[in-house]
Amino acid sequence: YFSKKPVGGELAAPGWLRGVARVLSYKPASFTRVAREYGLRLPRRTVDMLSADVNLICSLFTQLRGDSLVEPDVGVGPIYYRAPGELPQIVREPRERPLIYVGMGSSGSADILAQVLRQLSAAPVDVLVGGGVQLSDTSMLGNNIHFAGTVPAHLLAGHIDASMTHGGEGTVQTACLAGVPFAGIAMQAEQSWNIEECVRYGNALRFTKNDVRRGNVRDILDRLLSDEGMRARARQLGEAMRTMDGAALAVEKIEDYLRAAR
């Protein structure tokens, strides 16, 4: 991303950022302190400091496309948190209307989450809200909003009809695994990248804080539920993900490196 010009449909950093990456030598104080304590010598360039003997690239789309990588980068595919426990009761019981999963995680904004849920309160859907951001006042929310704490999101495939999440990589990966469209809101730059890859693939929509403040959540939800092209792409991606085991492949790649280093 930082070292090459874009080829075809691949995403790459703009030219000015690639230029900066080649010369930037900034080191966070915590890195230099630890290096000093343990007698380590840090690389001159910042981008080199962020590399290792083996870099496991957990990107879904890098693996899906079969992108060629340069050592020490090795593609392994998605690795996401598999929360223990069962799915909440609202997921397991019979229902007559769509079930929407909302997961804003710890990086989300309580104000944005509250506004999203208020707009979904008037929709003819049930809403399952995962853990993370805590709301101090839920009195304005409808009885179709169900809070569940930590949800084993990797088990939601076949149970939900769409989701609305932040753009953290693990959250985006489990949203894709569910095989239904999602709408993603970025809380930081890295999250924009994760959402953008899914938008380009065709299984997701991006939305912003301004969309929320303008009351556009219902329109976004309607498209997630009605856009058959997007729903087909989401099913396709979910099926592809179920053939991947990033964690197992990561172990294999680490063991390969250790054997070769003997």
Segments from the language model and where they lie:
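Short, acidic/turn-prone active-site loops that include or flank metal/cofactor-
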Residues: 1, 78-81, 151-153, 187-190, ...
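Active-site-proximal region of nucleotide-activated glycan assembly enzymes
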Residues: 1-71
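C-terminal amphipathic helix plus adjacent low-complexity
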Residues: 214-262
